Amino acid sequence: METPATEKPAGEKSGTEKIGVKRLGALSLAAIGVVYGDIGTSPLYTLKECFDPDHGIPSSPENVIGIASLVFWAIILVVTIKYVLFVMRADNRGEGGILALLALAIRATGGDRGLVGPLVGLGLFGAALFIGDGMITPAISVLSAIEGLEVGTPFFAPYVVPLTLIVLVALFTIQSHGTELVGRLFGPVMVVWFLTIAALGLTEVVGHPHILMAVNPAYGLTFLFTHGWIAFVVMGSVVLAVTGGEALYADMGHFGKLPIQMAWFALVLPALTLNYFGQAALILDNPEAARNPFYMLVPGWGLYPMVILATLATVIASQAVISGVFSLSRQAVQLGYSPRLDIRHTSDEEEGQIYIPRANWGLLLGIVALVVGFKSSSNLAAAYGIAVTGTMAATTILALVVAHRSWNWPLWLCLGLGAVFLAVDLGFLGANLLKVTQGGWFPLAVGLGMLLLMATWRKGRDILSRRLADGALPLDMFMQQQKDSTSILRVRGTAVFMTGGTDTVPIALLHNLKHNKVLHQRVVFLTVITEDIPRVSARDRVVVEGLAEGFYRITVRYGFFQEPDIPKVLRLCKAFGLEFEMMDTSFFLGRETLVPSTHPEMPEWRERLFVIMSRNAVSATDFFRIPAGRVVELGIQVQL
């Protein structure tokens, strides 16, 4: 049985064929404000880092044109061809992001255990690195913007770090209030940003048109082969031009594929190209400009207004990354890779606008440590690349699995694309691994730490589920016993027992029978299932089955972009003739007390870690939005 459809089917909003011209323009403007903040602020530091004095690369015409060519072709290959044209085809019912892609890849394997394990590990590590990226992006972006003050006068040098911290703390403090109002300004501000950097670059390109030779990839290849090892090191800075590429895919569900692609080709790509070429042309004319070519493009009268605009742009870029981490955290909870978290909606209209306190303050703590510890965008650049390139490589592999297994692309085509994409991704990753001791250790440490937490949680929950299933009574046997029994007293009201399995009796019910020796007039077994799709429509949300006199089984399905709301679900059951009066309904939940096993499946330290994570998880009452006054918790001791 099914409920009537009352909400839009999953993925429908991404159907670009239904988007009108005005709607397409509005979505493209919004995408410019959210999706392109990160990659749009990369010109602040990319070429500056490529010509870092530590690299020992002189600002000769051949080197300048060669590096400009590498930056241009990195953007074309990684962002335009890989993300905009290839990876964005792999939408999970309209949604993107590495965990959504992981769910697609697992589905594509058809349950092949030899593939599922490595793919899960790869996807989780990519997701963990994305969280590391979420710490570094706000730190390096805002730092690099405010460092523009130093170009005007050295007087501001001591104030760069304090001003950066003030901006970042303010940004994270407002998260709990939502960003709906200020978010309306993101698009227009970023349009002004892109038009401004394009105009600044165009001025220099017109004066030095021979910089356009950088469009020829031969100049980039010549630079690589001529400088060998040093060129390989420089590639670790070139990759900064494509940071934010993952955001295009991660935010696809908010805007749809076509608006993001339209914004890229119509404004973002031309603006970035003009600005990078303009910076390179400036260095050709004045090699001293290599110390901060972005701000040296700006006329003296416009420096401080540009610092303000750049700060606004980097705050917007930071907001996009913060929202991405919140979204990823929600997906991790729903897909079973994280303990339950306190997830709060900050908008009545936009489902994607959420606030997660633990993620928010954890990010801020890491960012403050980065700013105070590294002190400059140049120092942070070493830490930035590893997180970005690691996630990009993981995305490439997962997308290729989907292309071959789900889209039935021929193996030779997938291998060919994989060879090109992975050569670039792994080349960038290798160049950044050279910087592990200079700061690259930070995102690796964050990534490995988050991977450990997610893997431990998933493993621990699997063990716990098996332990509970081992001692569970089959539901059909229990129902037969109830038919034959006349000794169990039935009392007024409805009892809802939440259970993870649909064919076993909840342990909480058995404990209730054992201690209270009664059953309610109506007994409901409620199972909540999270599907590997972003959203489940209302018409497919609930299935109600009558098991026997007074016994019902309700199965509820959600997507990994949706949060459970049990009272709302129970109201939907009225369509099945099953009506709930909250003041007459009791919810029985089992609270597990975990104890170490004599034959552990995990090392003792991981068991302890899992226990700590379990204790700190948000209660089932709060997570499922069950009225606290109607909940009865029954303690259950479970041996891991």
Swiss-Prot record:
| Protein's UniProt keywords contain Repeat | no
For this protein, the parts annotated as crossing the membrane are: 24-44, 67-87, 116-136, 154-174, 186-206, 222-242, 264-284, 296-316, 354-374, 382-402, 411-431, 436-456
The organism is Paramagnetospirillum magneticum (strain ATCC 700264 / AMB-1)
Keywords from the UniProt entry: Cell inner membrane, Cell membrane, Ion transport, Membrane, Potassium, Potassium transport, Symport, Transmembrane, Transmembrane helix, Transport
Protein name per the record: Probable potassium transport system protein Kup 1
Catalyzes what? K(+)(in) + H(+)(in) = K(+)(out) + H(+)(out)
The molecular function terms in GO held by this entry are: potassium ion transmembrane transporter activity; symporter activity
The record's function comment reads:
Transport of potassium into the cell. Likely operates as a K(+):H(+) symporter.
Family, similarity comment: Belongs to the HAK/KUP transporter (TC 2.A.72) family.
Where, subcellularly, is it found?
Cell inner membrane
Q: Which domain of life is it from?
A: Bacteria
The annotated topology with respect to the bilayer is:
Multi-pass membrane protein
Cellular-component GO terms for this entry? plasma membrane
Pfam families in alphabetical order: K_trans (PF02705), K_trans_C (PF22776)
Q: Main location per UniProt?
A: membrane
Q: Which InterPro entries match?
A: K+_transporter, K_trans_C, K_trans_N, Kup
